[in-house]
Amino acid sequence: AALYNREVDTTELLSKVNLLDKAQARPGNLSGGQQQRFSVACALVNSPKILFLDEPTTGLDPQAKHNLWDLVRELNEAGMTIVLTTHNMEEAESLCKRIAIMDHGKLVAEDTPQNLILKHAPEPPQAPLHGNIEDVFLALTGHGLRD
């Protein structure tokens, strides 16, 4: 007996992450980026109300990354709550309605991307046209993303 009494359309899940052509492949035979996308498809089984994604675009080429960003937006617009961890500030700023910045395991700031930029980006912003979340991270933590 299954835990959930729902049919899962694996074709649809694989299609969402652009892996339909790999439907017969064993996970160990997939590239790193394909394995990453496969793990997202697995996380979508049974349509969770909350989706946890840990560094979901690590190892993805630029096209696959943007395709996954589109999927995350689509899922969120359909009402799914998504908790995303990332070191990619562009990704956080692009996908997240709210951002929590952690430093050494402590929450140092949490707000909308725009409010974080308004409150914490250095003046004048280091970005050519406006401040960004990376400027905020640097201002709040005092170190770069890889320090």
Locate each region found by the language model:
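Catalytic Walker B motif of ABC-type/P-loop ATPase nucleotide-binding domains
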Residues: 51-54
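ABC ATPase "signature
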Residues: 110-111
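Conserved ABC ATPase "signature" region
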Residues: 2-22
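Conserved ABC ATPase signature
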Residues: 26-30
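Hydrophobic anchor residue at the start of the ABC signature
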Residues: 40
